Amino acid sequence: MEFEYRKVEPNHRDFQSLIAELNLSLRQITNDTGESSFVSDAFEPSKDGCIVMYLNDSAVACGVFRYHESEVCELKRMYSNKAGAGSYLLKQLECFAIEKGYRKAILSTRRVNSKAVTFYCRHSYSESSAYGKYVGVDRSICFSKTLVI
């Protein structure tokens, strides 16, 4: 199984198709699509990154990072519908973020989304202080990781 990836913008049709799948999945898990946490029109190509993963020319995973503060990016809208694609995607997003000068990645997910929580822990993300709109929101859990150069 050999994955390929493409750096795209959030309006790319394959990204949009995968995000529709993500929204359905999140609604089933959390009763919320999470759409309000990411506005694709706010995507700034000089600071942000968006990747779609492919297997045999079929889009199987996607994710975004966006500027949070100096040297810190926030991972958003991570989704995979193929075993193994999520790990490869995360690595590519981290490498892309490093290319853009980021040294740390942060993210938030719902505590009830145990699959996501386990995934991030398995990839060396540690629980961290809540940030931004997640401060005081008990249903959310925030993670961070120092990006290795």
Task: Describe the residue ranges of each PLM region.
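Short glycine-rich hinge loops at helix-strand junctions in the catalytic core
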Residues: 84, 88, 101, 122-124
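A generic structural signal for beta-strand entry/edge sites
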Residues: 70-72, 104, 140
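Conserved catalytic-core motifs of GNAT/GCN5-like acyltransferases
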Residues: 10, 106-109, 121-142
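Short amphipathic helical patch at the helix-1/turn junction of helix-turn-helix
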Residues: 80, 110-111
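Conserved GNAT acetyl-CoA-binding A-motif
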Residues: 97-109
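Short, glycine/charged-enriched secondary-structure capping and boundary segments
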Residues: 20-21, 119-122
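Short glycine/proline-centered loop/turn elements that form peptide/ligand docking sites
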Residues: 86, 90, 113-116, 133-139
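Acetyl-CoA-dependent GNAT
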Residues: 3-76, 80-81, 90-91, 96, ...
